[in-house]
């Protein structure tokens, strides 16, 4: 049985119960404040601090509730919406030792639930991948017609924003660059500029679009690259990068680094 599901169901109930409690407490607090203001001209005294146990319990529940709320929200995007009142009923019955399902039934249902989530997730991912492929092809076709955009045989597109005067790196070189990577809609997924520190790496150990593109740049250049998914992360994507996504990179080639000497490597 998926341990995550155990946590999901319990925490979802906690989140719902906390929400209900917060509403009741807020209403009661507002009523008390009105009465206090009406009867006392001076500032109302501060409420006593909650006990360590109460604060700890609330903090744990609130943290869990927020995490699960985000999880359930993503599941709703797949078409699954759990009834909060039923979740609370299950928790109440469990605490009261009045379970209406056996352990075997619980395990079977949660396994089915897990399988359903996986099925819907895969279906959505497959659908998104097809849509991204189509959108990417349309984007690149239109982009290729823009002034200043050049294309290579591999399908890589680039635009020169500043042409440097230094040497061009080879695939086996180590380069130092500043870059910002975005999706075609402008969503930023990575940036050495934001981190305030250039990136240094062997040029033949990055995605193909980078290996090819940066070799076109003399040191001191600034290029904008448009990478077809086949030259980036392909049908699998990576992290926040969707499958079959076209990527856009603003790259500044700062330097070609010398490889560390054997003696230096031995010291590390």
Curated annotation (Swiss-Prot):
SUPFAM superfamilies: FKBP-like. Belongs to the FKBP-type PPIase family. One of its GO terms (molecular function) is peptidyl-prolyl cis-trans isomerase activity. Gene3D superfamilies: 3.10.50.40, Peptidyl-prolyl cis-trans isomerase, FKBP-type, N-terminal domain (1.10.287.460). This is FKBP-type peptidyl-prolyl cis-trans isomerase FkpA. Disulfide bonds: none annotated. GO terms for biological process: protein folding. Residues 1-20 form the signal peptide. Residues 172-257 form the PPIase FKBP-type domain. The gene is fkpA. It comes from Aeromonas hydrophila. GO terms for cellular component: periplasmic space.
